[in-house]
From Swiss-Prot:
GO terms for molecular function: structural constituent of eye lens. Residues 2-40, 41-83, 89-129, 130-172 form the Beta/gamma crystallin 'Greek key' domain. Gene3D superfamilies: Crystallins (2.60.20.10). The keyword 4Fe-4S does not apply. PANTHER family: BETA/GAMMA CRYSTALLIN (PTHR11818), GAMMA-CRYSTALLIN B (PTHR11818:SF101). This is Gamma-crystallin A. Has a two-domain beta-structure, folded into four very similar Greek key motifs. It holds the Pfam family Crystall. One of its GO terms (biological process) is visual perception. InterPro entries: Beta/Gamma-Crystallin, Beta/gamma_crystallin, G_crystallin-like. Crystallins are the dominant structural components of the vertebrate eye lens. Belongs to the beta/gamma-crystallin family.
Amino acid sequence: MGKITFYEDRGFQGHCYQCSSNNCLQQPYFSRCNSIRVDVHSWFVYQRPDYRGHQYMLQRGNYPQYGQWMGFDDSIRSCRLIPQHTGTFRMRIYERDDFRGQMSEITDDCPSLQDRFHLTEVNSVRVLEGSWVIYEMPSYRGRQYLLRPGEYRRYLDWGAMNAKVGSLRRVMDFY
């Protein structure tokens, strides 16, 4: 079972709230989040309720201020435990929506879609095995989006505002 602790103030100070299940941040008294401690597994945290807004992947470790998880502000309103996956990882990315156009199958991390596949946009995705994080920019930078097994017919389905994808990586729990 995963465990994550949210703190109102930087440096793990102020009121805290422990969580071990999805979407546990519905507490009205918890108004801001400036530091996080991830004790077990990997989590995705979201700026807004119901898994919306900016998304951030956090692996086991300490995040003493929101800038450490690339946060834009101190707002975290929902979270999701990323299930452990011990098998193979596989996804198919498509250059156009509804699984049309050039298709590339990926089984490992890719720091630059441009260098590897000559792509800067991905419009649809089929995640066949494992969970993945796609990043807006190369080298795992920019906005992040969690893709779990399933079909994403257009970039809006994974919460993006455009089809720009620079890199992607498998969600692996190393602890």
